[in-house]
Amino acid sequence: MARQKIDYGIDLGTTNSAIARLENGEIKIIKSNDGQMDTTPSVVHINRAKTNFIGLKAFNQIDADAKKALKEFQNKGIDSGSNTFFEFKRTMGTDKKYLCPNIGKEFLSEELSAEVLKKLKSYVLDETIQSAVITVPAKFRQNQLNATQKAAELAGFVYCELLQEPIAASIAYGLDVQNMKGFWLVFDFGGGTFDAALMKVDDGIMKVVDTEGDNNLGGKNIDYAIVDHLFIPELKQKFQLNNVMKNDLGQHLLRDVLKKYAEEAKIELSLNESASPYADDLGFDDGGNELILEMEIGIEQYEKVISPIFQRAIDISLKLLERNNLQGSFLETILLVGGPTFSQTLRRMLKLQICSNIETSIDPMTAVAKGAALFAATKDIPPNQQKRDTAKVQLTLKYPETTVETEEKLGLLVNRNYSSKSVSGKIFAEILRNDNAWSSGKIEIVDDAEIFSLLLNPSKSNCFTITLFDEKGNMLPCEPSEFTVIQGLKVANATLPYNIGIDLFDPSMGKIGVYTLKGLEKNTSLPAKGKGIFKTQKDIRPGNRNDQLKIEIYECGYKEDGSKKILNELINLVIISGEELPQFLPANSDIEIVLEIDTSRRITFSAYFPYLDETVDLEVPEQRQAEFNADELNTEIIRAKESLFNLETDAILVDYSEIAKMESELSEIAILLENGKGDYNTKTQVMERLREIFKRIDQINEENEWPTIEDELNWLLERMKNNNQRYGNDKTKKQAEQFELQAKEVSRQMNIKIAKELMEQIRSFNFTLVRDDIGFWINYIRDFDNNFSTHEWTSTSRARTLLDDAKQIISTNPSKMKIEEIVRELFTLIPEKEKAAISENDDSTLMR
């Protein structure tokens, strides 16, 4: 029977992957064809004969390939590369390329991921899979999601939906739990990523409340911590390693060789009190002695090294709970997902710091794939991609795929016109639950439409078979002939893990920042639509490609409106030029931006120009993350340390314990960078963590800006009072009193942004009051004259002539009108770049 539902769920993991499907109401993990394992190593190896090996056979090549590369470096000082690739999920959506020397070809991460997907597809022998639900970390960035979709396309999937991994795990867990209620935490610590998801069940409906995570935190970090803090110090103590360790490539290759043995020790110490790693055939040291790693690691020694990594994941989880006004004691349970969660160390830390009730009844290695398959069983394959057998009677079914009720309705419609085989006369149908414990009985389908009552087994996937009969009792083949209703759980839609915003110039703040689009706030249910009306800053001439509006789309953090662009993740840059517009668009025109995001977080963009009554629909171009430079990252670490020092010495409103904590984290980041400067993922992780520190530094600086802002606001109010007494009237007096009331409220809130907006209004009001006073304009002339050389006039001679004329008028026959005209013309002679520098603005950016 051709499938109408997707049915297949795939966990495309950093370290291991798995595939599952729903069969007769039960979730089945489809085992590998090389060892009958539930999971498949996410590893690709290509030999000299250009044959691809994926999974276990490829995994077995990692050690030999790494040792060969290290020896080539030791003997010849060259990088011979590797023909075995793993953990490439961490570089999805980046410009990272993996060179395969055996075939002289480079691969992007999505191309390697596609090979893993093809391998998983090959396990299914009874049909060809064309659709699947593929899971992704909740905190995956847009470029990573795009790369995952691309991998599915390269693997031959015609249709693919993406599902967040914590949701998939929750579905697998939730179906086995009776009377679910309250909050629980999904703690998904995988091989390469970490997600914390706060879930809640209300009346059987499960939804994501909030998420947090780190796309560069996982089992790989533990492996390298063991290498850097246990293995390499041990080798340095016994051998001379200067030649290898002083070279970035040599250090990188040695770490890669030792990683396998670190992983083995990690697994052993998950359950035992000690481990005895042994590795030989590592080449030679500087003195020609054979390198051999042989040591004993006790649990205390191990925990000292890896606890900070687990602690970071726990801190992220605690931050998530605090943000939602919850404590660990409020949780029903913690659901563990991912191989590293087998660790006795981690489980003990979780019980002590978050919640003692840890759920271990489901397999952390397969929970995501099983949940994805359950989810896939509720999702339709698009009708234009379904393969229908029109020789069978075609049916349309309407029913709830998931429910918390034990009785539901099925709507059944017979589509006689869609069947190539003629069907006449009455048609009867019987609906049979697959456990044979319930049947609808044979019921006539009157006027080709009927509603059936269904009785469901609780907390199970209920699979039903449809059988059609003609008036004589002959069976009529039909399609679809099966459907499934999952009882006991109803899953709300996935949510946005980030705010989605665009860069805008804020005239009140005098700078460009990233602002969230209304409707695309973090934790908004998908699909979602965000829109906002903004202003253009310059003229756009039709047909002119150089006249451009640039809209940068960003993923940004929680409550971070107005933050610097560099501190947010750029998704895409959309450019609208004069080539897209049919008529002239003047500056200060309205533009309505609309972003729509579907359940797989695919984005569509449109811009409406009311002045032209024109809508521009554009594809959101793909954006790849570039590799970060280790030296530049080190410079940023130094800059962050200097900023913290300045806060300690200069800031008035500062929590010194928080400063100390950030200083400690910077030291940790510096060590991380030093040990992994040759590793792509390590540098990405360093940049992500630096961003968080710089965001907090900016917030503290803004908080400390208030005393200065308050002084300036009070000065403006005093000036306004004086000007109003001298030039005002009853009407302006009321306006001034209103400003004073607003200023009191702003001061009470200590709101810097609103204060700056109010100050701009007061300045404008002051200008209105004094503009009729000739002394006001004379002061401008004197200021321009005294600071003439500091301005880069567009015409120095014209500016000089105007000032000389003004001084002549002032000394002989003062005229307010003439002086004002000269001042306004002088302002036009100030160059645009000088104005832009003053306001930190780019006129191709939209304005709030």
Predicted ranges, named:
Residues 4, 158, 290-299, 303, ...:
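Acidic low-complexity intrinsically disordered segments
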Residues 29-37, 176-232, 432-450, 462, ...:
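Glycine-rich phosphate-binding loop of actin/hexokinase-like ATP-binding domains
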